Regions:
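Phosphate/NTP-binding elements of NTP-utilizing enzymes
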Residues: 2-185
Length: 185
């Protein structure tokens, strides 16, 4: 399968290991994927390399269906949550689509036997024992996601939502940390 990447410095055939100061993901993703028994596709490798590259704050991945965009983005989100006190927001066009990521996060947490201090299915918020939170949001109710500072925003199914204003007006200001990033898939 041929993957076309618009940025020449983003590889899609191998995960690039950067120095610890430069990379966004503070934990190595390769061994983590091995523990999950996941062999990433070229499109997933490109997403990993793009988000890890300090040059790019906003990563937009226009990738065909059934390529594991949501899955790899959730793995990236969980890796970020393993850094104490991190806040991750996963946005979807509606709450029924956000349930996919909520279930994925629960399964990843269960797989690695992480201690959960809060698992609120109604509000779709998970807090792990290191103080990190993973929150699901909907473009339809973006106001419920503001007022916090996020380390990572994952905008799932970005092509399905008219979320330009939701991101630019409501969510972009929540990426107020020096190294905070967003992925649009």
């Amino acid at each position: 399968m041929t993957v076309e990447v618009s940025r020449r410095d983003i590889l899609c055939d191998e995960i690039v290991e950067l120095g610890s100061e430069a990379k966004f993901l503070k934990l190595p993703i390769g061994p983590y994927l091995n523990l999950l028994n996941v062999t990433p596709l070229p499109s997933q490798i490109a997403i990993i390399n793009a988000i890890n590259n300090p040059k790019y704050r906003f990563v937009s991945a226009a990738v065909s269906r059934r390529q594991g965009k949501t899955y790899i983005a959730n793995i990236i989100g969980q890796l970020v949550s393993l850094v104490p006190g991190s806040n991750i927001l996963i946005m979807s066009p509606n709450y029924s689509l956000s349930q996919i990521s909520f279930d994925l996060q629960r399964n990843l947490i269960k797989h690695f036997d992480l201690e959960v201090t809060k698992d609120n299915a109604k509000d779709k918020v998970i807090e792990i024992s290191n103080g990190s939170t993973v929150r699901m949001g909907s473009v339809n109710q973006v106001d419920s996601c503001v007022g916090r500072s996020y380390d990572l925003i994952i905008f799932d199914e970005a092509a399905l939502a008219d979320g330009k204003d939701a991101f630019n007006v409501a969510l972009r200001p929540t990426l107020d940390k020096e190294n905070s990033k967003a992925i649009f898939i």
